[in-house]
Every structure is written in C-alpha cells, then in structure tokens.
C-alpha cells in the first residue's frame, strides 16, 4: 500500500497519510504509453507525478513497489533500461506516475544521453499536468 502526502512533500510506503481529508491508496495500475520526445499537450489531462534519479537508482522498481505490481515498469540490472518517458495510470486514471530515463551513468552513447536530456527537460518545463517530482537517491553511493 502506498500513499502520497502533500503536507509532507514526500511519498511514504505502507503508511496511511491524509490527503484532502481522506487517504489515497493505489488500488490498481496500468501502463498507458511511452513517448520518445515530449510535446506540449502530451499526457492524459490528469495530475502527473514524475519519478526521476540517476540511472539504475531504482525508479522503475519504486513504481512497481508503489503500485504493488511487479513487472508493471520494466526493470534491469543494466543502467539505461528506461529509454522513454513511460506513463502509468493509477486508480483508473485518477493520476499518472511518469517513469523518466535516468541520468548520469547509463551505458549509452553521448547522442542518446543528449536526446534523453532534451526529452526530460522538455517534460519537466512544459508539462501542464506535472504536479510533483520524486527524485530517488541511492544513499549507498557518493
């Protein structure tokens, strides 16, 4: 069970948190689509929460854990598995979790990294539905 708290500006796992007088629990999740680039107007017209972080920090695993749906977001031990902006519908379209490609140590060429930087930058600055970004940090590394 996962919940989102606006008051604490954080996502907590396995802890009921108040949201607008009630509790927000992820009951179901579904992969919707992927974008290789972002254009203003892309998305589904509902609130989006992006998941960002370095390559292989566990962004896709985090989405799977929140949704309690192993395999919803594809994972790999190889950095750079997520190459597109992936949209996942939560609670029958109540909101979207958006899995972003990682930054930093992906085992891809410089041209591919530049494409990702442009895609992520466009999404973060132009999405009209983006309400927050969860940045994952692996505390095991400096």
Regions found by a protein language model. Give the residues of each.
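Conserved ATPase-coupling elements of RecA-like P-loop NTPase cores
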Residues: 106-111, 142
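Inter-motif core of Ras-like GTPase G domains
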Residues: 112-140
């Amino acid at each position: 069970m996962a919940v989102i708290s606006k008051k604490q500006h954080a996502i907590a796992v396995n802890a009921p948190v108040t949201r607008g007088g009630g509790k927000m629990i992820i009951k179901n999740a579904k992969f919707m689509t992927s974008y290789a680039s972002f254009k203003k107007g892309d998305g589904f017209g509902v609130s989006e929460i992006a998941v960002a972080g370095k390559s292989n920090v566990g962004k896709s695993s985090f989405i799977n854990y929140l949704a309690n749906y192993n395999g919803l977001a594809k994972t790999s031990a190889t950095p750079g598995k997520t190459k597109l902006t992936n949209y996942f519908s939560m609670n029958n379209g109540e909101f979207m979790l958006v899995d972003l490609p990682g930054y930093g140590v992906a085992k891809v060429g410089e041209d591919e990294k530049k494409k990702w930087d442009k895609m992520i930058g466009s999404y973060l600055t132009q999405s009209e539905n983006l309400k927050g970004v969860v940045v994952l940090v692996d505390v095991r590394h400096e």
